[in-house]
Amino acid sequence: MNFKIYETKIREEFELVLKWMHNEFIKLRTGRATPAILDGILVNYYGSMMPINQLANISVPEPRVLAIKPYDRSSIKDIATAINASNLGVNPQVDVDIIRLTFAAPTEEVRKNLVKKAKQVGEEAKIRVRHIRQEAQDLFKKDSTTIEDDKKFFQTELDNLTKELNKEIETVVSHKEKDIMTV
């Protein structure tokens, strides 16, 4: 069996791990407002649950402020209610046709907890990478058409890919830590 076939599949799975990690990092509040903070919040809109970004335009007029302008003004109270129920730690300020969310700067203790969470996400990503690596090793070992030299080559290449991805994970976690600790 050709290593390139395995390599392509492994790289795709590694990319999925990186995407997952980036999505988890977006959820960590660094003190700056980002529309992604609202991604998991669903609004009861005429009997169906819909994400806020499908009901409103979300912008960042200031670094710590989100402005939510509903497409339908009648949904403004439903959106504010959903935000209150989401435990974001902000109170929506409802104007006539816009909702403003002002995020306070996180305290030192909160930032340290966020750094811990970022490290946990990084460790979870590394665990996922190890599982992918183990599955690939098992799959390749079961391939009876492969000669022993190819198996050793595959193992070396797989180890290199894994080390490369783990370095990338560590770099991303390090950048996120710096981002969180910046006041």
Curated annotation (Swiss-Prot):
Q: Which GO terms describe its molecular function?
A: ribosomal large subunit binding
User: What is any Pfam family matched here?
Assistant: RRF
Cite a GO CC annotation: cytoplasm
Q: Which domain of life is it from?
A: Bacteria
Single GO biological process annotation from the record: translational termination
The UniProt entry lists the main location of this chain as cytoplasm
Keywords carried by this UniProt record: Cytoplasm, Protein biosynthesis
- SUPFAM superfamilies, per database record: Ribosome recycling factor, RRF
**Would the keyword Cytoplasm turn up in this protein's UniProt record?**
yes
Give the transmembrane region(s). none
Is Cytoplasm among the key words of this record? yes
**Subcellular location as annotated:** Cytoplasm
Name the Gene3D superfamilies for this protein: 3.30.1360.40, Ribosome-recycling factor
- Role, per record: Responsible for the release of ribosomes from messenger RNA at the termination of protein biosynthesis. May increase the efficiency of translation by recycling ribosomes from one round of translation to another.
Cite the NCBIfam families for this sequence.
frr (TIGR00496)
What family does the Swiss-Prot or TrEMBL record give for this protein?
Belongs to the RRF family.
Q: What PANTHER family is this protein classified in? A: MITOCHONDRIAL RIBOSOME RECYCLING FACTOR PSEUDO 1, RIBOSOME RECYCLING FACTOR
What protein am I looking at?
Ribosome-recycling factor
Please give the organism.
Ureaplasma parvum serovar 3 (strain ATCC 700970)
